[in-house]
Each structure stands twice: as structure tokens, then as C-alpha cells.
Amino acid sequence: MYFCNVFQTKYRNMLRIAVQSKGRLFDDTMNLLAEADIKVSASKRTLLVQASNFPLEVLYLRDDDIPQSVASGVADIGIVGENEFVERGEKAQIIDRLGFSKCRLSLAIPKKIEYPGLQWFNGKKIATSYPNILRNFMKKHNINADIHVITGSVEISPGIGLADGIFDIVSSGSTLVSNNLAEVEVVMKSEALLIGNWKMDEEKHQILNEMLFRFEAVRSAQDKKYVMMN
């Protein structure tokens, strides 16, 4: 999609966006920027890269560092998974729901177990990388579980005797199947969010509004294409 680029000379400041440095969310984010005719060289994977035709700086970070970077003002805006945004609890504003990188946070247990309901987790040990979301969910439902916080390879925990069940991201469910686990409760659905620090100056707000206009144009074009195909 082509947009008329008059912004390099119009603005003195640059908007800084924090994005995930690798993985599915990185790929989806770069695709969105490309569709919005914002040219960022993916080959220059340094920490900070400037778009060649739009007043935007791209700051590459780990996904769990993005909410804090936006809340603290290191970045003006960021694209992050809703799961990470909710887990971190940082004070940033949700500007837009982007509709990609969709997944869910779910409870799963060994598939050989006949699951009677949420009360099964009372007194059980649950491995997760999202303790805050899980703790709030368990408190809401009056479940007293032992939350064991680990990073990475959460799905192997029941198989090695580390936990009775897990609370983790699920996309296709294939990872659960390969580890003999069954998804029993969907706690939260997640997608990519555009978050922002509203302490930006007026000029940066104008740049942000232009970016949002382009993102909406991309979505509208995708919707029309989908309708035509069906």
C-alpha cells in the first residue's frame, strides 16, 4: 500500500516505537509497518533503527521489556502481546488492538487425568511464566494453588514431576499435544496491542495519528480483500 510521504521535512521530532526483537510478533509487526508503507530495514538489526521514509525510530527489545519502556518514556509507543501487557501491569495506555499474533493463556493438565472442573487445581502445583495473571484468576475463583514460576519450557513441567499442571500461552495446541497435555481452561485471550505513553508532545501525537490512519487503511484493505475472496 502506498502513502504520500511528506513527513521527513514536516516534523522535527521522531516517534519511537518499541517492538519485539524476534519471533512471531516481530514478523507480524514488520509486516504491518511494510503494509503501511513505513520502511524499516530488517537487515540493520541494531538496537535502534530509523525508518527511511517516516519520522519513526524502531527500538528492538524483549517482549517483556516493552511495557516498562513505554510506561517510563524510553519509547513513546510499543507493540506488545496483551498477555505481557497485563502480566507486567505497567501504566501505559492501550491505543489500538491490532488483531494479529493471537493466542490464549490456558490451564493444561496431563491428558490421562479426567478433569472434573476448576476445583481440581486446589492444592495443586502449577508451573507458569505468568504468575500475576494466574494468581488473580485463582483468587477470583477461590482456588488455593501453589504457583511455581519458571521461564521457558513450561510445558515439560508435569512430565518431569515439577508441577501438576501448567498455565501458558497456547496458539495451535500442538505443543500441548506433543507433551501429553490437555487444555482444560481458557483464562485469557490475547492479541497484539499498540500501547502508548500519553506524555508525548503534540508533534509526536500528530505522527502517531498518521500512523494510526495508515494502520486502519491496511485493515480496511485486508477486510475488502477477504470479502472479495468469499
Predicted feature residues:
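Active-site-flanking structural segment that lines cofactor/substrate pockets
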Residues: 50-68
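Pocket-flanking alpha-helical
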Residues: 64-69, 74-90
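Small-molecule-sensing regulatory modules
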Residues: 11-56, 80-93, 97-104, 111-230
